[in-house]
Amino acid sequence: MAFSRRWQAGVLCVTGALLALGDAAPAVQRAPASTGRLTALVGGTLLEGYAGPPIRNSVILIDGERISAVGQVGSLSVPSGAEVISTEGMTVLPGLWDMHVHTMIVGHADYDHWDKAYAPQFESVIMPAAARQLLMAGVTSARDLGGPLEASINVRDRINRGEMPGATLYVSGPFIQHEPYPNTEAYRWGVQGPADAHAKVRAIAAAGVDVVKLIDQDLMTIDEVRAVVDEAHRRGKPVVAHAHRPEEIRRGLSLGVDCFEHTGLATAPAYPDDIIDAIRERTAKMALGPLYWTPTIEGLLNYEYLRDNPEALDDPAWHEGLPEPIVADIRRSLEHPDRLPYFQLTAARRPTLARKFKQLREAGVTLLVGTDSGIPMNFHTQSTWRELDAWVSTLGVDPITAIRAATYWPSVAMKVDRDVGTVSPGKYADIIAVRGDVLRYIALLQRVDIVIKRGVRYRPDPSRH
């Protein structure tokens, strides 16, 4: 079937012989009609983002930027004049989320050099390139955790206004922490006392951040941490906090942090018993909702592979939107990945991941897919599918659960599930499609064939068809 064409007949209604190829048709789901452009995705196996079985021979109708109906061939007709896009032989699923990205960095190994050389280009070049790279990799939404306040807000808003392509960003602005590291004051804000903590959170909330990023809370006073969390919640902002050290977790749990990030910088083989007990106590309090955790494991799991197979770094997709001198500088910084200080403890940390991941699952946290993309060798074009692959292929998570951790649950965590997170009538048409069976071969997500965000097709480029 041709990939795309303008359907001129009155309706598309596939015969019973075709219908027999799939499951019995579910009830057609519809949203109120509107008057936008009409598109139909026809024929693929749909993973809605819920936990139900796949929908074979699916039909998804898109009216403008939102989904108007979901059904199957033979039970859902395609309106006259709609553009029909064949998804035959593909898995169709909600656009992916990456719940931990850094758009101000794009894989360079030397942060100090990067900040000094490229900070003036963060807003105009680096962050837009990162957001576009995420989108073209099938990541239609991302949580950007740590960046200059004004640049983060401006890039997010330009994307939302349709002025440039990119993943929809949910931004934290600067890290809130005990004190900024040297020469990082533009995107790391220190707090000195509870009053200052309240003031800093009020400032970023007033600027329009979506979430508050708290780190090094074990170095802060209890009253400072409480001030950050309470002020954020007072202003309707969830708090995301580092979980690198045990005391960071203890303080975050006791004071109401909503989501923890990472699995820890230490090489201890497991989380201490008291922390697991505290997590269990928190997850048992159903009235508080889920306790979220973004483990960001693929960078650790894949380091040795990338170190020993440097051709994997040659994928030109991560160059997109970056001037050649910046690409060349990134390449130079990665010439000797085995020497990078960033990864010297990776060999000792890597064996702890499976145990910690299992502990978190058994303690009842709701795990989210996030990658720390932008850190050394961790390009925005590759990290999200690798995280999903690591969950499924290395850690034994079933594919549907992993996919929901990158679609449904992030939308719930960010309180935008009325608009995104599943392929459902009335929600934004954030949809991707991949040739082949993703439930059997999760790594197929490394080559996304179709990317649609808010009803606009970005991959493949429609102007080339």
Predicted regions and their residues:
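Bacterial N-terminal signal peptides
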Residues: 10-20
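Histidine-rich, glycine-flanked metal-binding segment
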Residues: 30-35, 46, 52-93
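Metal-associated gating/positioning segment near the N- to mid-region
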Residues: 90-158, 182, 223, 244-262
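Acidic/histidine-rich helix-loop elements
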Residues: 103-122, 178-195, 264-270, 338-345
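Divalent metal-dependent hydrolysis catalytic cores, especially in the metallo-beta-lactamase
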Residues: 127-150, 167-174, 207-217, 238, ...
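Active-site core of metal-dependent hydrolases
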Residues: 214-349, 368, 375, 395-396, ...
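His/Asp/Glu-enriched, well-ordered alpha-helical/loop segment
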Residues: 234, 337-344, 350-434
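C-terminal cap of metal-dependent C-N hydrolases
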Residues: 406-408, 425-465
